[in-house]
Amino acid sequence: MISFRNVVGYLETIADKHYEINSFHSGMMDEVDINKLGATDYVILYAEPGNVVINQGVLTYNFTIFVMDMINDEVGDEPNKQRIGRVDGYSETLNILQDVVAEFKHSLTTQSWVDGEVVLQLPITAEPFTARFNNLLTGWSATISVDVNNKNNLCIAPINANT
């Protein structure tokens, strides 16, 4: 059975192997101290766990994933620096989000870092965001749902049998 830890591990491996992602974090987004992250941590892939649906034969894990970067405000003339940096940030982080989705969607190939038993539900809607901390972060968030086998096997449950 593919566990919650396994799915988080796939995301972490994708972040580690991707040439443009510099760090991976998971947990509740409101618990992150963005101000403690350094410039070398960006681009960040962040996975916030959502609900899990336990169904007959299928377990569905839901995550909101964020791909975020600091805005480069050194590009362009003064009135346009932030706008140009934001557009570039949106473009680059959306491409990275598509790469993450491709790893899950094409997990049946031998080149994916995701187990072939994991099925990503499509379509996925991505939403742009910009947040101001000590720096200006921009990127995309998307809620993903991944289905895995759920054996629902009472024989292997660590419970005393009703005899």
Show where each model-derived region lies.
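Extracellular/virion structural assembly segments
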Residues: 1-9, 56-58, 67-108
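Small/polar-rich, solvent-exposed N-terminal microdomains that initiate assembly or binding
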Residues: 1-58, 107
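Acidic-leaning, charged glycine-interspersed low-complexity segments
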Residues: 23, 38-42, 89-147
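Charged, low-complexity C-terminal accessory regions
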Residues: 48-50, 132-163
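Oligomerization/assembly interface segments of phage tail-like spikes and tubes
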Residues: 57-74, 135-148
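Generic alpha-helical propensity signal that fires on short helical segments
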Residues: 63, 83-85, 158-162
